[in-house]
Regions:
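Non-transmembrane amphipathic alpha-helical segments
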Residues: 159, 163-180, 196
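Extended assembly-interface/linker segments at domain junctions
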Residues: 72-151
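N-terminal, leucine/charged-rich tether regions that mediate assembly and partner docking
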Residues: 1-88
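Short, charge/polar-rich alpha-helical segments
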Residues: 147-161
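Short, charged, amphipathic alpha-helical segments
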Residues: 183-194
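Conserved small/polar residues in nucleotide/adenosyl-binding loops
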Residues: 202-204
Length: 204
């Protein structure tokens, strides 16, 4: 699947019961029902390790698992996917599947997601001299983030998160400014919008 090496294929079911046991506190009340409403079943499809693909491990990363999650609905709750991503204590690339569409998701300081695509449109490349760099490349492939010179991957992810936050604040303020009838308040909002835009340029 997605051009990953055949030698990495394992296809091992991951039962929801394991998640219910590990996250009993987090899935209390109706949260378990919400999880069940999102997730149909899960299968570990690939294990990318030194043994399976002949790319050396690092101290931090001994393997990267690919987990296919069959969804019951397309508009799932991110919190459920974040819980799944932390289950192993290992690096996990998640393939979300709904009807004929796939979405890649990966957790690196926060949940990062690609656009929904058809299977034939997705190609995962094992780029890197070790599993650490393969993981970093998976993160950039999924998120579309370009790491700027002088930044680490994590630093760039934080920069992108700050940019997204500023862009949302700008959009919210622009909407309020359009509705505002008092000229003084409208002017103050326009000034704040300009400040946010200048800040967003600093982060580019």
């Amino acid at each position: 699947m997605f051009d990953l090496p055949k030698t990495s294929e394992i296809r091992k079911p991951l039962h929801k019961k394991l998640i219910y046991e590990k996250y009993a506190a987090e899935l209390s009340g109706n949260k378990k029902d919400k999880f069940d409403a999102d997730i149909s079943r899960m299968i570990i499809t690939n294990e990318i390790s030194e043994a399976s693909v002949n790319i050396k491990a690092t101290e931090e990363i001994s393997a990267i698992f690919v987990l296919q999650v069959e969804l019951k609905r397309k508009e799932y709750d991110d919190k459920n996917i974040i819980m799944i991503s932390k289950l192993f204590g290992q690096k996990l690339l998640i393939v979300l599947h709904y009807e004929n569409a796939y979405q890649l998701a990966i957790y690196e300081t926060r949940l990062l997601k690609a656009d929904w695509k058809n299977e034939g449109e997705i190609s995962l490349r094992l780029n890197g001299l070790d599993l650490g760099s393969v993981w970093d490349n998976f993160v950039t492939q999924v998120s579309g983030i370009n790491v700027q010179t002088g930044n680490t991957l994590v630093e760039q992810i934080n920069v992108e998160a700050e940019k997204e936050k500023l862009q949302k604040q700008i959009a919210d303020l622009e909407l309020k400014a359009r509705k505002e009838v008092q000229s003084k308040k409208k002017f103050e909002m326009v000034q704040r919008i300009q400040q946010y835009k200048e800040l967003s340029l600093i982060h580019i």
